Amino acid sequence: ISLGLVGSEMCIRDRYNYSRESNPTRAYLEEIISNLEGAVDTVACSSGMAAISLVLELFSSGDHLICSNDLYGGSTRLFTLQQNKGLKFSYVDTTNLKSFKQYIRPQTKAVFIETPSNPTMQISDLKKISALCQAHKLLLIVDNTFLSPYFQNPLLLGADIVIHSATKFLSGHNDIIAGSISTGDHKLAKRIREVSKTVGNSLSPLDCYLLIRGIKTLAIRQKSQQENALKISNWLNRHPRVSKVYYPGLIEHPGYEIK
């Protein structure tokens, strides 16, 4: 049996017509993360790096991004790769707003920050940086992997996009690779989802299910991990063979007072 459809009829689809674009398990996971981050929409991705790659697709050749000078190595490698395609990146100390401002140019479109940063745990003041970004009409993109929504909600502090390597704290069970992108802006959410449908880096239904399972214990895991990390950091801080401890929970850490 054959069926002829005109173009407009072909565009009428069920929400779950094509699993790569969406499926019930993935939609439920995205709703959960959106609720945790205070977002209007979330896109679940196949990894944290896939999430960052997807966000970079929002920009065009010649666009300039300002980035933390202390970043996960995989992110800097990806940015180096993107330079071959025409994107420009400047790495700055995002804990110093005075030096930060001088890197803004007419081609600057966004700021990409990890806070705490990987690996030296630098803390950037998201409220102040978001105010600066808004004044210059720049997107603020925050990798929230290290703190998770349990400890920090960048969207509520003025960020436009929040990224997670959900492989880590969100999942917590060391048995999946996953990522996510959340935003509080409806127009931006539509752009991100359209890119996601096109590039096809979505998370599989099984991995979505496993991530949902992991998020159920996020609060109790994060509370215990923070308590243990503080005890270990204090012990190391007193150890005669340890010269420096990078942990923002220590009172002498330069970012300790930032909330």
Label each region the model flagged.
Residues 8-9, 18-30:
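A structural motif shared across PLP-dependent enzymes of the aminotransferase-like
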